[in-house]
Amino acid sequence: MEEYKALLDEKMGRVVLSLESEYKSLRTGRVNSALFDKVFVDYYGEKTPLTRVANISVPEARLIVIQPWDRSLLSKIEQAILNSDLSMNPSSDGSVLRIKVPVLTIERRKEIVKQAKKIAEDHKIATRNIRHELNNKAKKQEKDSQITEDDLRRILDDIQRDTNFYIKKIDGIFDLKAKEIMEV
């Protein structure tokens, strides 16, 4: 029974970490350099994360400064940002890119909350798939007479209880993110 608990905690813990990681790249009321985690630059024929070819800083609440380590990449970085789904317009002064980030409109905030909700739902589905996988494993063990019917019932109840815990955790993370996004 402990093997199920450990396996469930490991797999569902990874789902929660994945959700938190995806939420870092969503734009909120606050400017965050993690917005650029999914921006890739063509660096000598390789798609390279922007964070590996430039320093990204947030000197002011609504300003992002991107300083490439190799100045020849400035135009490629600018193009990568323009081609991304961030809806940002960088301005170049020859050595750094500056991006003035406008305040999000209510409509845009609502769109981002919908996007966050979909991400949370996808992670809840992943959690339920893990539950399904572990339930099947336990049922197979009972069928093969490795565990008793009472043990099976206990294991299934434990798996369901832990699944409910992780689903509530995902809902809580979503609620916090939605509140953060809607903050003006």
Curated annotation (Swiss-Prot):
Principal location: cytoplasm
InterPro entries: Ribosome_recyc_fac (IPR002661), Ribosome_recyc_fac_dom (IPR023584), RRF_sf (IPR036191)
Function: Responsible for the release of ribosomes from messenger RNA at the termination of protein biosynthesis. May increase the efficiency of translation by recycling ribosomes from one round of translation to another.
Entry similarity comment: Belongs to the RRF family.
Subcellular location, record wording: Cytoplasm
Keywords annotated in UniProt: Cytoplasm, Protein biosynthesis
Keyword rRNA-binding attributed: no
GO CC annotation terms, alphabetical: cytoplasm
Biological classification of the source: Bacteria, Pseudomonadati, Spirochaetota, Spirochaetia, Spirochaetales
Transmembrane segments annotated in the record for this chain: none
Pfam families referenced in this protein's UniProt entry, alphabetically: RRF
Gene3D superfamilies: 3.30.1360.40, Ribosome-recycling factor
Name this protein carries in UniProt: Ribosome-recycling factor
